Amino acid sequence: MFPMVTEFMNYGQQTVRAARYIGQGFMITLSHANRLPVTIQYPYEKLITSERFRGRIHFEFDKCIACEVCVRVCPIDLPVVDWKLETDIRKKRLLNYSIDFGICIFCGNCVEYCPTNCLSMTEEYELSTYDRHELNYNQIALGRLPMSVIDDYTIRTIFNLPEIKT
């Protein structure tokens, strides 16, 4: 008869332990109920990007001296720089500059090492297209000023996200 009593005691202890575990999980679930949702309705709401965000590269044609430092520091040798040597003035003249954003890894080395600061990162991150060949930007497309999210009146910008507490 004693083994039956000990089995009931073990069963009771296991039941209490299971109820405690379920209660702990339920309390964690309830603690998340008072937090704000993290979901952002993307096309209508956008986050303000940070100051050091690595978006589309902006290129200023007039500042470039065709030194090709950007090509040397790029881990995938991506920027294509075409230039012609002007023998009378002994300087390089830039003819064409292009970057294929379908291949670019947005590491920012070209921007960081450019001696004339003709390259800069923008806050523009919407680069999706239906054809991958449209992602090959020449100097005209790279020179286009980025559209600021803050200036667009049709989009509600979200400045502060609720911090996720762990």
Curated annotation (Swiss-Prot):
Protein name: NAD(P)H-quinone oxidoreductase subunit I, chloroplastic
The protein's assembly and partners: NDH is composed of at least 16 different subunits, 5 of which are encoded in the nucleus.
SUPFAM superfamilies: 4Fe-4S ferredoxins (SSF54862)
Needed co-factor(s): [4Fe-4S] cluster
Disulphides: none
Residues that coordinate or bind [4Fe-4S] cluster 1: 64, 67, 70, 114
GO biological process, one term: photosynthesis, light reaction
Keyword Glycosyltransferase: no
Keyword Transmembrane annotated: no
Major subcellular site: plastid
E.C. designation(s): 7.1.1.-
GO cellular component: chloroplast thylakoid membrane
InterPro entries attached to this UniProt entry: 4Fe4S_Fe-S-bd (IPR017896), 4Fe4S_Fe_S_CS (IPR017900), NADH_quinone_OxRdtase_chainI (IPR010226), NDHI (IPR004497)
